[in-house]
């Protein structure tokens, strides 16, 4: 679907939403500068996307209902700035990260996004299953930072902070659990971040920044929360997607210009782990450090104070100690 087609369908939807009565095909054709046949084709395309639009001969069109999905033509008008070059998807897919990876390998530009309201094969860090039920916002962004691989280690933190800022604008406050989770104040998970990429030698070729946000429901009520629950009412998925994408774009561009140092203090102020007793393990389950979280450094490493000193952690699984 081209951006021009999206733009015309946005105009049609806005006209239908703004009118208390049927909108004639003739009026829509005049506003768009196209034929009534072209208008009918756009209406048919909107039907395929899940919009219910009544058409009555001699009267016109009425919008009955809209799909509960972060569709590109709903999200794009809400975005600020010019970072996002291309938006795809919006409904159900296996994995937005897989889709975005395929686009990146085909040469898709930075700022290409794949959106979905449900994933059937979502995954988290280390290939773990990531429950992605219907009514969520799942977005994967193609990034092409001109940096060497070690510099990109902090990107999960930058993206996570961008997501937190985006949710702030919706009135949803979250805390950051290093390295890739966003939690509500009681420790339940609201969103997660997964970055995957390809490097050529020391240089990054591309990175896919994947984000999943619980909006309608939480997969596990004891361990996760939803935006709707925290906000107190039903939040349009397009609004959540646009807020999150805007937050990521601003944070990413600041990181490109100034590195991670300007983010360190804000990240610590939003840290769920600050001052808590934790155990950090590697992928094989080996304990890397146990002690109190002292913060993060300018390189994005988690600092854990043990009985013998402070251990900087580059990567690992963090669990709270109960003892």
Name each model-derived stretch:
Residues 2-166:
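N-terminal lobe of the biotin/lipoate ligase/transferase fold
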């Amino acid at each position: 679907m081209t951006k021009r087609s999206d733009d015309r369908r946005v105009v049609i939807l806005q006209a239908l939403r703004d009118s208390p009565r049927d909108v004639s095909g003739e009026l829509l054709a005049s506003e768009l500068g196209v034929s009534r046949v072209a208008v009918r084709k756009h209406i048919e395309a909107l039907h395929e996307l899940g919009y219910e639009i009544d058409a009555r001969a001699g009267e016109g069109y009425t919008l009955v209902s809209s799909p509960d999905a972060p569709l590109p033509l709903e999200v794009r008008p809400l975005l600020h700035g010019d970072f996002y070059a291309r938006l795809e998807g919006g409904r159900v897919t296996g994995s937005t990260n897989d889709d975005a990876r395929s686009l990146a390998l085909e040469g898709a530009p930075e700022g290409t996004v794949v959106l979905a309201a449900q994933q059937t094969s979502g995954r988290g860090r280390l290939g773990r299953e990531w429950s992605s039920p219907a009514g969520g916002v799942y977005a994967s962004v193609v990034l092409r930072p001109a940096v060497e691989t070690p510099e990109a280690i902090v990107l999960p933190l930058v993206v996570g902070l961008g997501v937190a800022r985006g949710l702030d604008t919706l009135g949803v406050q979250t805390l950051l659990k290093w390295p890739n989770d966003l939690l509500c104040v009681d420790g339940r998970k609201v969103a997660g971040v997964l970055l995957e990429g390809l490097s050529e030698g020391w240089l990054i070729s591309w990175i896919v920044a994947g984000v999943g946000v619980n909006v309608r429901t939480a997969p596990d009520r004891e361990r996760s929360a939803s935006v709707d629950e925290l906000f107190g009412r039903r939040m349009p998925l397009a609004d959540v997607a646009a807020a999150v994408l805007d937050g990521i774009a601003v944070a990413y561009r600041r990181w490109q210009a100034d590195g991670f140092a300007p983010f360190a203090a804000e990240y610590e102020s939003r840290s769920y782990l600050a001052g808590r007793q934790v155990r950090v393990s590697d992928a094989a389950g080996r304990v890397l450090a146990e002690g109190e979280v002292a913060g993060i450094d300018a390189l994005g490493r988690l600092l854990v104070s043990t009985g013998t000193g402070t251990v900087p952690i580059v990567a690992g699984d963090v669990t709270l100690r109960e003892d």
